[in-house]
Swiss-Prot record:
Belongs to the influenza viruses matrix protein M2 family. This is Matrix protein 2. The gene is M. One of its GO terms (cellular component) is virion membrane. Gene3D superfamilies: 6.10.250.1640. The record marks H37 as: Essential for channel activity, possibly by being protonated during channel activation, and by forming the channel gate and the selective filter. It comes from Influenza A virus (strain A/Puerto Rico/8/1934 H1N1).
Length: 97
């Protein structure tokens, strides 16, 4: 049996909990960790699109163009754009006669 869970035990005619009024540091720490975990999980579910979009796109600065001639920067930008445009072409329209 785990020390971190509350166990209901029959006490006379009522059901009670052994952890009520406990000053056990392990039980207190487990309760705090459980509450923090619940709060973080709720925030994650509420804002997961914002959070993961920020990590996926916001933190990527791309390669540095410092010291690269402007003509090469333009060529690189065009290559990147054509790669994005080519990726959009994976949808194929099929016409049946």
């Amino acid at each position: 049996m785990s020390l971190l869970t509350e166990v209901e035990t029959p006490i006379r005619n009522e059901w009670g909990c052994r952890c009520n009024g406990s000053s056990d540091p392990l039980a207190i720490a487990a309760n705090i960790i459980g509450i923090l975990h619940l709060i973080l999980w709720i925030l994650d579910r509420l804002f997961f699109k914002c959070i993961y979009r920020r990590f996926k796109y916001g933190l990527k600065g791309g390669p540095s163009t410092e010291g690269v001639p402007k003509s090469m920067r333009e060529e690189y930008r065009k290559e990147q754009q054509s790669a994005v445009d080519a990726d959009d072409g994976h949808f194929v329209s099929i016409e049946l006669e």
